[in-house]
Design a protein with these regions (language model features):
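Short, low-complexity disordered leader/linker segments with a strong preference
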Residues: 1-38, 360-384
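Short, glycine-/small- and polar/acidic-enriched structural segments
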Residues: 28-184, 191, 198-204, 227, ...
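Short polybasic/polar patches that bind polyanions
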Residues: 63, 68, 171, 211, ...
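Pocket-lining segment of extracytoplasmic ligand-binding domains
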Residues: 179-181, 186-284
Length: 384
């Protein structure tokens, strides 16, 4: 059992639940088109790339599009696999997740039929930020800094985007860590503090929290390997079949949320919404995770997130690469996802009706001096 990641076990538990309780696959009655509907949304305020859900929750653009009298309940998932499990157990109707948990969830059609229906974004440093302990040497580039990980203790959440990024980085640069550990973000944080960890890969906003609070230092992201990670929205297939009006309405509202977020003058408003939905994260940290510009030597770039909403060749290639990785590590039984599990028809139609194309926009990185609410205190590890 020790060789099996806890992330994989989490998914296995759902499969076992399905076997013991065949009723898990029963169809829910979502009502007839035009009738009020009640939706339960699984969302991740602790994953910056998925904050369009926070905008939906706080601003309620969905009220404009769903049938009058409809209601929405929100359930926080501390990681994507929790949201995916809730969807497989028919507890969430719509889920906002990172690439790996979305792909795994929709692949389990023997448990429940789910579909990927929209893209939250693609980025180099939303899901995979590379960190080293503060005492690590300062190097001239992210590539040199990550090579220091050879013979060191490195942690990722195995089976996640951080694992894929980690394994590809180690292959590319011939890095052989002394230990390649499976640790969630809480354990990584405590182990950096205790001096029991040399490097890790984690997602935003936890990455910025660790950097800005002086727990670890930022050394890079997936630009080193030329890869992008992504976030996606999944829906229950029964919802799609029974209530096309609700599916279209929710995705219309999702596009509104994306277009609001894409405007720099709204960045701080989005941060304030995220702040109301999280605990233990300052607004400065949340802003840095979403729009803060880190120096190049720390792996920073000019763009923090590419807002797609719909699907294109880049998104398809990212999904294909992620599925292939999950197959190699024996999480997926297939090397490629069946095409019908990704339903791009809804976003394609809405984008066409509005005269828009993907990608919609980019969240441009801003110098910390641009933070709207005063000076940000930069950590001692900050290097220009």
């Amino acid at each position: 059992m020790s060789k099996i990641s806890s992330w994989t076990c989490l998914w296995s538990a759902v499969a076992c639940l399905s076997a013991l309780h065949p009723s898990i696959g029963n169809s829910k009655d979502y009502g007839k088109p035009g009738e009020p509907v009640h939706l339960v949304i699984g969302y991740q305020p602790y994953y910056t790339q998925a904050w369009s859900a926070v905008i939906q929750k706080e601003m309620k653009p969905w009220e404009k599009y769903l049938p009058k009298g409809s209601t929405v309940a929100w359930e926080i998932g501390l990681q994507g696999a929790i949201v995916g499990n809730a969807m497989l157990a028919d507890k969430n109707d719509i889920g906002y997740m990172g690439d790996m948990p979305t792909i795994v969830a929709i692949s389990k059609r023997d448990v429940r039929e789910l579909r990927m229906v929209a893209v939250l974004g693609l980025a180099n440093d939303q899901c995979s930020v590379f960190l080293s302990r503060n005492e690590a040497p300062d190097f001239k580039s992210p590539e040199e800094a990550v090579k220091w990980w050879s013979d060191k203790r490195v942690a990722v959440a195995k089976g996640s985007c951080t694992d894929r990024s980690g394994q590809e980085t180690m292959r590319k640069f011939d890095i052989k860590p002394a230990q390649y550990l499976n640790q969630n973000i809480e354990v990584q944080t405590s182990n950096f503090k205790a001096g029991r960890l040399d490097g890790s890969i984690t997602w935003e906003p936890t990455a910025s929290k660790m950097v800005m609070e002086g727990i670890a230092k930022r050394i890079g992201d997936t630009k080193m390997i030329g890869k992008l990670d992504g976030g996606f929205m999944a829906m229950q297939h029964e919802l799609i079949k029974q209530r096309p009006d609700v599916v279209k309405g929710w995705l219309e509202a999702e596009l509104d949320a994306n277009l609001f977020w894409a405007k720099p003058e709204n960045y701080m408003k989005v941060v304030e919404m995220a702040h109301r939905n999280t605990q233990g994260f300052s607004k400065e940290v949340l802003w840095m995770s979403m729009a803060g510009k880190y120096p190049k030597v720390m792996g920073g770039g000019d763009v923090r997130n590419i807002m797609y909403y719909g699907f294109d060749r880049d998104v398809e290639n990212m999904i294909r690469d992620a599925a292939a990785f999950l197959h190699v590590i024996k999480v997926l039984p297939m090397a490629e996802l069946p095409q019908d599990l990704v339903d791009a028809s809804w976003t394609n139609e809405i984008l066409k009706q509005r005269g828009l194309k993907v990608p919609l926009a980019k969240i441009e990185a801003q110098d910390p001096s641009k933070y709207p609410e005063g000076k940000i205190n930069l950590p001692a590890t900050w290097r220009e």
